[in-house]
Amino acid sequence: MHNDGCDKKLRHAIKHDTEHEPKFVLFTRPDVNTTQDLFDNDTELNVNLTLNLPTKIIVHGWKSDIRLTPLVDMKNEYLLREECNVIFVDWEKLAAEECYLHAIWHTTYVGQRVAEVIRKLRDTGAEDIHVIGFSLGAHVAGIAGFLLRPYKIPRITGLDPAMPGFIFASNSEKLDSTDAEFVDVYHTNVLMQGKIERSGHVDFYMNGGVTQPGCHERSNCDHTRSAVYFAESINTEVGFWGWPCPNLWEFTIHACPPTTRLRILAGDNVDKSARNYYIVKTNAESPFATRDL
């Protein structure tokens, strides 16, 4: 995390600059690679948006953008599986801040804009709305969910929600289980870039949640794996399977060994009645899903 040159004055100087305004990019079948603006003439929804279809809203994180490979893979996997609307929240110009604290400040504004879009979708007939946020984007999703109350987004998925700057944040500023009807969270780099504490109705700690097999260098590999695993989960025939564990300490001391009797499916097709902690084992390379516990 870089805070060099952080200046609180910039918190207000950039936030409402039209050049830095978040953009909403729509993808639909049949041409899944054609980018479309979600809005025609700034206010009317794109005619290619089909409101009675499932709508997936994907939010990237700090120093990232909608071209991040696992997020693109996610979009492609959804559109391969079914007719749906995939909307990317492109807040690249705000997320590109060298000062991480500035990027955190911007999550509130981006969350407000996402909430406005979801309200527009809901008011015009959309019902099946699923917001997927990676890293800092997970908290953007949570802020949007908080602002939309008493309405609740049907589902929010948090992919390794960012830890730095959020340990003492209030629930209005971060993702938590009250932000949607169902919140599922996937931890892959806790105590480093990702939060260790539970943030959803069900939290999956992939390979224990700290480091990931096959990630040997100090980079974003462990953190990004959350998005990689989730993208694969959309269409995998093998599935990512988790077993319950009361907490990470008990997993560390081998007090909750794998059990097939209580295992559940993790990922996009998760059982929405699932609650609490689960541990998921993966392979070290693609395909990552494994039947082994």
Regions found by a protein language model. Name each.
Residues H106-T107, V140:
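Non-catalytic cap/lid and distal C-terminal segments of serine-dependent acyl enzymes
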Residues M1-F88, A95-H106, E116-T124, R149-Y151, ...:
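Flexible, membrane-associating and regulatory peripheral segments of lipid-active enzymes
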Residues H60, I132-A144:
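Glycine-rich nucleophile elbow surrounding the catalytic serine of serine-hydrolase chemistry
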Residues R155-G165, H187-L191, G209:
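Active-site nucleophile loop of the alpha/beta-hydrolase fold
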Residues T124-S135, I156:
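Alpha/beta-hydrolase fold nucleophile elbow
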